[in-house]
Curated annotation (Swiss-Prot):
GO terms for biological process: translation. Pfam families: Ribosomal_L3. SUPFAM superfamilies: Translation proteins. Part of the 50S ribosomal subunit. Forms a cluster with proteins L14 and L19. Belongs to the universal ribosomal protein uL3 family. Keywords: Ribonucleoprotein, Ribosomal protein, RNA-binding, rRNA-binding. Gene3D superfamilies: 3.30.160.810, Translation factors. GO terms for cellular component: cytosolic large ribosomal subunit. One of the primary rRNA binding proteins, it binds directly near the 3'-end of the 23S rRNA, where it nucleates assembly of the 50S subunit. HAMAP family: Ribosomal_uL3_B (MF_01325_B). It comes from Symbiobacterium thermophilum (strain DSM 24528 / JCM 14929 / IAM 14863 / T). This is Large ribosomal subunit protein uL3. InterPro entries: Ribosomal_uL3, Ribosomal_uL3_bac/org-type, Ribosomal_uL3_CS, Transl_B-barrel_sf. One of its GO terms (molecular function) is structural constituent of ribosome.
Length: 216
């Protein structure tokens, strides 16, 4: 069954495996998330659930969202995200989803907004090769030619210096090292996108699901 949860990145630490090896992990406060809305093929054309996460003062909720929460008779939340699922029959509006939907050893896909790094050149932003650093070189970190003579303009999509980071990034196939249901914590091996305190989305691994379907 497909599953997903919203969480907050708390930071990174390390734990010891039974064989004594150190494993770098990211600590995520996953849930509790409440099911705010359920969408079905009959009513909306596709199956999905809308999850709410995080506390928010009622004075900060605008009128359209306030009406949305009141319509479904759930408490207002800071974040709302939609998860497409094959089967939504087992979930109902008001159900609470916690970190224990995932187990140790599972593979997950994590999505977040990468940390903004400001204005960056082509070498840092696009991994361009740099020029000679020795005496007599006219360029060191310049991007070089931007195109041919014929068009006499820069084509769209050309890799140029600009703002780096602040984009939606998904890291595939990360392993769940530990789950603490009481504290709603999930420890994920390796780094996940985003700054401390940022919102991240955890879903079951797409590649693992495809491999399992192929094997069957």
């Amino acid at each position: 069954m497909q599953k997903g949860i919203l969480g907050k990145k708390l930071g990174m630490t390390q734990i010891f495996a039974p064989d004594g090896k150190i494993i770098p992990v990211t600590v995520v406060e996953a849930g509790p998330c409440v099911v705010v809305q359920k969408k079905t093929t009959a009513t909306d054309g596709y199956n999905a659930v809308q999850l709410g996460f995080g506390e928010i003062r009622e004075t900060l909720v605008n009128k359209p969202l306030k009406g949305h929460f009141e319509k479904h008779q759930v408490k207002a939340t800071r974040y709302l995200r939609e998860f497409r699922l094959d089967d939504v029959e087992s979930l109902n509006v008001g159900d609470v989803i916690k970190a224990d939907i995932f187990a140790e050893g599972e593979l997950v896909d994590v999505t977040g907004i990468s940390r903004g790094k400001g204005f960056a050149g082509g070498v840092k932003r696009w991994n361009f090769n740099r020029g000679p650093s020795s005496h007599g070189s006219k360029y060191h970190r310049r991007p070089g030619s931007l195109g041919q003579r014929r068009w006499a303009r820069v084509p769209k999509g050309r890799k140029l210096p600009g703002r780096l980071g602040g984009e939606r990034v998904t890291v595939l196939g990360l392993r769940v090292v530990k789950v603490d249901p009481e504290k709603n914590l999930i420890l994920i091996k390796g780094a996940v996108p985003g700054a401390k305190g940022s919102l991240i989305t955890i879903r079951d691994s797409v590649k693992a699901a495809r491999a399992k379907a192929k094997a069957q």
